[in-house]
Regions:
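Extracellular adhesion/carbohydrate-binding repeat motifs centered on closely spaced tryptophans
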Residues: 1-83
């Protein structure tokens, strides 16, 4: 920040980004206190449908991964993957 303090956790700079304990920007899957999020290659938090490899996931408007629910008629299991 402006005072030179290293930021960690979620930071908003246009999009939301996750900075790990060493202050490095995280990409890929992020587990924050038991809730899963996904940050793309530029580090921005994703929302909506995500195809990771050959598996579909749904990320809510707040970025959290949906699980054990139905979205747009598609069933998501306990691990968030479309069944």
């Amino acid at each position: 920040d402006a005072a030179g303090t290293m930021k960690t956790g979620w930071v908003q700079a246009g999009s939301w980004y996750y900075l790990n304990a060493s202050g490095a920007m995280q990409t890929g899957w992020v587990n924050d206190n038991g809730t899963w999020y996904y940050c793309n290659a530029s580090g921005a938090m994703q929302t909506g449908w995500l195809l990771d490899g050959s598996t579909w996931y749904y990320l809510n408007a707040n970025g959290s991964m949906a699980a054990n629910t139905t979205v747009d008629g598609y069933v998501l299991g306990a691990n968030g993957a479309m069944l």
